[in-house]
């Protein structure tokens, strides 16, 4: 395969993998999760898809990795714009069959693929793994009514302060993504990838709270495969099942790795099985 790096006019850094052969290839754009960068977790999937005959693109959202933009600013609507910017660039590449563009998303990116597909008919196929359906339920679902009211009041006060003063609190990623799985993962990777050791606005919690990928999934008509991990404590499998139920497309499947945790899917036997299932889905529907 041929691997090249590019920087788009929007400031988005991407890596473009193309299989051997002078033909127009179908394309899979891989969309990362919460504060993810393209060199972490994604290459194994990108390489597997490219070896199977698909061109692939991995990229950094604006504000993360090698892309331009305010460091750590995570806004789902902006990240969806980034996906569409990548589609715009990709369809102009001579080696790409622009009638066969698919999206693959993981975790938060597994929600973004629905947001993008709902806005852009060029998306012909989706794989979404380890995603959530409703950010409000995800963030506040285990709170009682009093705890939820207090939590939302605190967020609203912080948002008002930002509006009035322009100042806001920035925290480490694991202050927001605070489950034990994520704490272990981010502690492990930030030594190898210092660009993962960033501060993000605490109000990112509010962005997550207001994000409901299921609403976009209800507008999507292209084939959809949803992958869940049965032991996922980041985005519990019930969220993935709710997302599956919301998908409007008549061509949809739900695949579960019952014994896997959130970060298990990227390596070992779990990865091998999931990548094979996803590759077959793209071969059939893209």
UniProtKB/Swiss-Prot annotation:
Question: Which SUPFAM superfamilies did the record assign?
Answer: alpha/beta-Hydrolases (SSF53474)
What is the similarity comment for this entry? Belongs to the AB hydrolase superfamily.
Q: Sorted alphabetically, which keywords does the UniProt record give? A: Plasmid
- Every copy of the AB hydrolase-1 domain together lies at 26-268
Transmembrane feature ranges = none
Q: What is this protein called?
A: Uncharacterized 31.7 kDa protein in traX-finO intergenic region
Q: Name one Pfam family in it.
A: Abhydrolase_1
* Cysteine disulfide partners in this protein: none
